[in-house]
Amino acid sequence: MLPRRAYANSVFINCPFDAAHRTLHYALVFAVYDCGSIPRSAQEVVDAGEVRIDKILRLIRESKFGIHDISLTEADTRTGLPRFNMPLELGLFLGAKAFGRGKQRQKGTLVLERRRYLYQRYCSDIAGQDIS
């Protein structure tokens, strides 16, 4: 049994897990720990039979804060397809804040993007957000 995690100290980290972005992922995990909080991500294994989207929804529900790196929405060089996992998870997090009840409405979000204002070209609905 895993230790009980406090909602107020849990930070959902939504960033790429591939080798090219491993340094960023480790830096985010370190920074969250260093601030006294608990990093949470889809890489957690509590139940290997849990469907991935259900795991993500559970982690969002259990986390007051979220860090979302949406910088990988460009087309993949091998497939030509964009990666929309990170914007999708950001949308789920923002939806939990907007439509949730009680503590869900207290969620705080940090959104990261590589180039300033690039997100407005592919995700204009968050154009009013402060993106770092």
Where are these regions (language model features)?
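Conserved N-terminal substructure of TIR/SEFIR domains
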Residues: 1-65
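Generic detector of short, locally flexible boundary/turn motifs and exposed helical patches
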Residues: 4-8, 30-34, 73-79, 97-100
